[in-house]
Amino acid sequence: SLYAPSAVVISKTQGASADAPAQRAVTLRCLPVGGDHPAPEKACAALREAGGDPAALPRYVEDTGRVCTREYRPVTVSVQGVWDGRRIDHAQTFSNSCELEKQTASVYAF
């Protein structure tokens, strides 16, 4: 096959809109695991556990005890591509980067 069954582009944008220019973006390929994501095995495992649904990621994260400030500096993440042959086009905004990291673990850690 020309295309991996699960390959996505994950991006981060400062602000509350996924339409703003991305500050960072990485590729993540699963089966075979690869891309330029810094922890592709962990990110693929988290997405697999969430059934390929990025919106379901927060419920799978363990409580690390990390405390975040209440500052509002929104960060928007987006995931676009294909997961198990299904098209993914997801965007989600977090109140700040600490909340993003606390709630989503390895997928957006880049």
Curated annotation (Swiss-Prot):
CC per GO annotation: extracellular region
**Known role:** Strong inhibitor of subtilisin BPN'.
- State the name under which the record lists this protein: Subtilisin inhibitor-like protein 1
> Site annotated as Reactive bond: where?
R70, E71
Against HAMAP family, the record matches this protein to: SSI
User: Secreted among the record's keywords?
Assistant: yes
Its family? Belongs to the protease inhibitor I16 (SSI) family.
Give the record's keywords alphabetically.
Disulfide bond, Protease inhibitor, Secreted, Serine protease inhibitor
**Pfam families from the UniProt entry:** SSI (PF00720)
The yes or no answer to whether the keyword Transport is present is: no
Residue span of the signal peptide, if any?
Answer: none
Note the subunit structure: Homodimer.
